[in-house]
Amino acid sequence: MLFMAGPAASWSLRPLGLHGVPQALCAVLLTVLVMKTLVLGDTKLEDLHPQSLPLNKYLNCYRCLLETEELGCLLGSDTCLTPLGSSCVTLHIKNSSGFNVMVSDCYSKEQMVHCSYTRASPVFGFWIFYQCCFLDFCNNPDNRKNSMH
């Protein structure tokens, strides 16, 4: 039997509406796959050093790789820059039992085809809903309810 000490000992997946270990593992796998795609997807060399870019030509977005409404950002809270004409995005990963996690990031013009789009995820029983917006920090938790519909 495995025992955990510290804060991890009191963590439980029950409040998130998960009803079994397989479902929890699928949810974690799906979240990791989405985060990998967002982080490593279409990274270009000039995107790696945004400090040297003129800010008036770029949209500032909120970035969080794992977030829940109840707990806020759990992994990777940051900002990102994307050229004007692109968008900020929040992906909602949901299932029918009420599980809902979010991933927020910048989207390039080429990725904007997914805006306001719902699709099935690679993990059975989950789906992904994309929401895009076009103002500075419109996808952060405080602005999301007003700027994303």
Swiss-Prot record:
Keywords: Disulfide bond, Glycoprotein, Secreted, Signal
PTM notes: N-glycosylated.
Ranges for domain UPAR/Ly6: 59-149
Disulfide bonds: C61-C88, C64-C73, C80-C106, C115-C132, C133-C138
Molecular-function annotations in GO: identical protein binding
The protein's role, per its UniProt record: May have a role in hematopoietic cell differentiation.
Top-level taxonomic group: Eukaryota
Signal peptide region: 1-41
Descriptive protein name: Lymphocyte antigen 6 complex locus protein G5c
Recorded GO CC terms: external side of plasma membrane; extracellular region; protein-containing complex
Locations listed in the record: Secreted
InterPro entries linked: LY6_UPA_recep-like (IPR016054), LY6G5C (IPR026110)
Tissue and organ expression note: Detected in adult brain.
Keyword Kinase: no
PANTHER family the record matches: LYMPHOCYTE ANTIGEN 6 COMPLEX LOCUS PROTEIN G5C
Carbohydrate-modified residues: N95
Keyword field contains Cell membrane: no
Subunit structure of this chain's protein: Forms oligomers.
Main location: secreted
